[in-house]
Amino acid sequence: MMTKMMKTKSSPNANLFAALRAAFPADLDAIAVETENGLHYSWRDLDRASAMIANLLDGLKLEKGARVAVQVEKSVEAMLLYLATLRAGYVFLPLNTAYQSAEIEYFIGNAEPAVVVCTGRNAAWVRPIAEAAGTRHVFTLDDDRTGTLLDAAARCSDRHTVAIKKPDDLAAILYTSGTTGRSKGAMLTHRNLLSNAEVLKDYWGWTKGDVLIHALPIFHVHGLFVALHGALLNGSKILWFSKFDPKRIVAKLPEATVFMGVPTLYVRLLAESGLTREAVRNMRLFVAGSAPLLIETFNEWRERTG
């Protein structure tokens, strides 16, 4: 008598990085990120660099679900650290660069990260706080592509198998602004972040050929999740600005199709004489978020840009 063996259907990997990586274009040598200083990163660069940092994190023998707290200036390498943390299956915790010692002490004490990454200039006071809270690993990362994190990652392989995650596994923790008491950590799962990115990709009509101007900080939702995930999930080129420079951004508008910003950024762009209908001729989507946009600002923007 023969017994029919039933195959168990394996579940797909719910790791957000797996979805983002699957959206990379076929031509991995195409430019993925162009910085305001003329540096270019290909999609292959993003894949390899994130793999190296992920291998570094794995080599630390962290516990499952370990938190990686990051307070660094905006840079492509900081973005790669985020992707690497997802890729390796750990939990990313971005911290506002304006936070001082008392705030950092609270967040690190509350979140209990296994890894803390800070700027070189802040390491002297961040390291004692982290070590007192039980953090075993402290690295530095600066916006000139230097620091102990990149030094250590440079010795790691550029091949990495994406960690298997379930939809409801934690991907990131973002602390609230603390308007009703002490800041609280909002727990965001891989499912949360991917579903949000997919909905916005569809709603905003991301298409092949879209180019994003990324001028937002990456320590909060708008810059890290809404803008970045949208571009990566669409395989879109990113024009990267580490600092908001209205004149240089206006000069890049003809090369872009999508821009996301907070209302104050739109006010600053309106002060530039180069902001004309001709300058935005290729733009199809401007998004204002994170705070209310005054109707006066909206009307002036519409008048200037059409």
Residues covered by each model-derived region:
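Structural core segment of the AMP-binding/adenylate-forming
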Residues: G59-L60, K64, R87-A152, H160
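Conserved pre-ATP/AMP-binding loop-to-beta segment of ANL
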Residues: N13, L28-D29, C156-Y175, R182, ...
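Adenylate-forming
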Residues: E73, C118-W125, L216, F244-D245, ...
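Conserved AMP-binding/adenylate-forming core of the ANL superfamily
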Residues: P12, D29-S75, M79-L83, Q100-E105
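A short N-terminal helical cap/helix-turn-helix that marks the beginning
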Residues: K9-A32
